Amino acid sequence: MTEKRKQRMKTRNVILLLLLIAAAYACFLPLPRSIHVTHSAVAWRNCDDANTPTSVTMDGIYFDYLFREDYFDGAITVSGFPETFKPLPRVTFHDGMGMLFYQGEQGLLEPMFGWIIPSPEGSAFTIGVHNEHGWSADTGLNITGPADNRYEAVQLANKLCQRYHPSFLGTWTFE
């Protein structure tokens, strides 16, 4: 083997190693997305036809990972729900669902407000609001947007649950 060929192979191996390191590094870096939106939304229950118009503001950064759980740093506020105007610690998403815990007095976490399933770009969401007994697919309060009426909210909630939280398939179907 000539000296020139050895040098080319050495250069090629170094370049391949650098590319491999860069690819591995890129796989573990997040893809951050700024989200600054206010959506019209509908608060509704699966057990009746009642619905209440509201709005939800998302303001923060969504960190989308390839091999880790995604998370959101920022604020999610719902008009008509004063408990959501408090600080919101980082929301980590497991299988597409995140839990909303707001901070109360002296920085202590209050009981869980609910869960959220957003689209990663923040263009749509559904929130299940917990009460003192938790949340039920049959009678629990949901807030879904963007939606202008109950029908749109139910359709969007079903779509989000099935797409971003696959374990819901066949378990929860909103009507």
Regions found by a protein language model. Give the residues of each.
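Tryptophan-anchored aromatic micro-motifs
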Residues: 33-52
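Exposed beta-strand and adjacent loop surfaces of beta-rich binding modules
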Residues: 36-38, 71-73, 124
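Non-cytosolic head/periplasmic domains of membrane-anchored proteins
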Residues: 88-175
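A short linear-motif detector with a strong N-terminal bias
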Residues: 15-20, 35-37, 53-55
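Extracytoplasmic/periplasmic/luminal assembly and interaction segments
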Residues: 49, 53-104
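N-terminal Lys/Arg-rich, disordered targeting/topogenic segments
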Residues: 1-9
